[in-house]
Amino acid sequence: MARILITSAIPYINGIKHLGNLVGSQLPADLYARYMRGRGHEVMFICATDEHGTPAELAAAKAGKPVEVYCAEMHEIQKEIAAGFRLSFDHFGRSSSARNHRLTQHFAGQLAENGFIEEVSERQVFSVADNRFLPDRYIEGTCPNCGYDKARGDQCENCTKQLDPTDLINPRSAISGSTDLEVRETKHLYLRQRALKDEIEAWIDSKTDWPVLTTSIAKKWLHDGEGLQDRGITRDLHWGVPVKKGDQPWPGMEGKVFYVWFDAPIEYIAGTAEWADANGKTEADWERWWRTDKGAGDVRYVQFMGKDNVPFHTLSFPATIMGSREPWKLVDYIKSFNYLNYDGGQFSTSQGRGVFMDQALSILPADYWRWWLLSHAPENSDSEFTWENFQASVNKDLADVLGNLVSRVTKFCRSKFGETVPAGGAFGEREHQLIAELQERLAAYESCMEAMEIRKAATELRALWVAGNEYLQSAAPWTVVKTDPERAQAMIRLSLNLIRLYAVISRPFIPDAAASTMASLGCDDWSWPTDVAAALERLPAGHAFTTPDVLFRKITDEERAEWQTRFAGVRT
């Protein structure tokens, strides 16, 4: 049994996330966590809300609430919606936790002690109208790289180029909209990433199995232009982790907080400690996941994130870990994603464009969305959500293929043999051919899941469903029963067991449908079907079941048109 540590990029607190956020981190991480648990491995799956920085302050101000109150409320909302999508976190924490405060300050102290922190006097934008320095995200303007007119002072969300506020064309305050800005001098702490470049580069070069997307972004940031740069890790904000050197004051840094991208990844570790606190565990229980000197040496650590988060996870966070000179666990594999676009444009939280997680759950259950998003995950290139494609995929894959098989088998059995698994005779050549095909396809599915090739895994899973449908169609028990009832019983016995097999292997993608199917079958044996032939004997003759309701209903043209119109505008 392996030990798998899984983290998803933690979502910003500034509002409910859209489907593009979901498919770029949390949902594929959940798929992998569920699969690994299903195979019997020990899994620790951690996520949290990212509560510090400019987005939190701006969103709270817009909502007319103190930032602490706003963050507490939004954490509960995001937690509830995540549960609605059946995201199976072992813990969903908060980057504003006391654990993360202490751990962030600890790392900063270690970095300073080891010579990897430098105090820098710099010129920063000051808003006369707002009477304050404006951190990166408090400044908006036109991107000098692509011309996008709502670029932020730290990064353009359109082209992903990292920026400094002074790079922006026609900059303005995100608080007041004022263009009355000045550049004044202030002091900040910088993480000396350049001093760690050789270590970081050697580490990245050792990751020969990483996706091309991850590696290419990391190496681009290492080598393009002037190469890896030192990074400011403090900000002039009111809300965040106060700057301390361990548990001691940091002279000259009074009133400042750590940059959100410094403390946010540390929450992966702190969140695991929060899990221990919440579940009556000891320090050793969480340290065995993170400290290589305390049991984490055999842990495989996998991160999931959108491509815009890759630079921070391949460079800045590893620099923090390495520079601490303490035995913390570094990531083994980073699964990164391109963007999911929406009907010809981009999903956007800040602009309210697209379908958001709460809206999605208000019109259809989670499994419909999980299946479409995962089977269209933007792995090798950007992908696009359209309502036509969504309708077609749900209707064909879920309703016509999987749902139809479950319905036909259970209803036919009920009408001819009652709601118990029939006995029948031995399996014939047709059944043995199916078993061989299923065994081969199951191996392909497992291989894709192990490799985190999500779209390919969905394709292989669908092929497994199709194989069962093709068998049922060619075996035609509804015809055979007229002349050879015992043979028809054997076919249905196999088919009922096949439904259980499908529930088990489909659970990572569609957990609710899997659970309801197993409940209808009166079965709680979720053991993985390593041996397909044995798995197809799991429900013995005489085992009682109940005919389930429709597993997946079809989306009508009228519904599709109505939703397309409803979500064509901007969420306010």
UniProtKB/Swiss-Prot annotation:
Q: Which UniProt keywords apply?
A: Aminoacyl-tRNA synthetase, ATP-binding, Cytoplasm, Ligase, Metal-binding, Nucleotide-binding, Protein biosynthesis, Zinc
- Pfam family of this protein, just one? Anticodon_3
'KMSKS' region: where is this motif? 346-350
Could you say which EC number(s) this protein's record lists?
6.1.1.10
The cofactor note from the UniProt entry for this protein is: Binds 1 zinc ion per subunit.
| Record: residues binding ATP | 349
Subunit structure comment from the entry: Monomer.
Q: What is this protein called?
A: Methionine--tRNA ligase
- Species the sequence originates in: Cereibacter sphaeroides (strain ATCC 17025 / ATH 2.4.3) (Rhodobacter sphaeroides)
Q: Name the gene.
A: metG
